[in-house]
């Protein structure tokens, strides 16, 4: 039984546009549950959902959510049924939420055993 492996990269400088990136590899069962901690306050302006290729390519139509400390999906359900064939971009501001939270939790479901990808989130600071 494999454990999930997640590397989180965040800006160390307070740029107006904050970047948070999760490089993930799912556990046995195809799930990921990983917290990024810091202070996040602003409008989500862009998200990219990139799938690995080859042997660690996720199962097609896997699901991604990013939840704030209240359990709200800041992607508003737009991370459902992600295609593994191409990077999915969410950059329509009407399809994402404002965020004001000290933790953002990446959750991936139905990706397949030991499959991976990279989720990148950009927040325009308020």
Language-model features: locations:
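Surface-exposed, low-hydrophobicity beta-strand/loop segments enriched in small/polar/acidic residues
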Residues: 2-126
């Amino acid at each position: 039984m494999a454990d999930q492996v997640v590397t989180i990269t965040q800006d160390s400088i307070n740029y107006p546009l904050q970047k948070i990136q999760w490089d993930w590899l799912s556990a046995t069962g195809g799930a990921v549950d990983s917290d990024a901690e810091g202070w996040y306050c602003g409008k989500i302006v862009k998200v990219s959902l990139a799938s690995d290729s080859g042997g660690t390519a996720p199962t097609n139509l896997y699901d991604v959510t990013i939840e704030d400390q209240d359990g709200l999906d800041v992607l508003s359900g737009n991370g459902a049924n992600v295609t593994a064939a191409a990077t999915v971009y969410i950059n329509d501001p009407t399809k994402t939420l404002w965020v004001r939270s000290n933790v953002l939790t990446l959750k991936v479901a139905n990706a397949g055993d030991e499959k991976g990808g990279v989720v990148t989130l950009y927040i325009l600071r308020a």
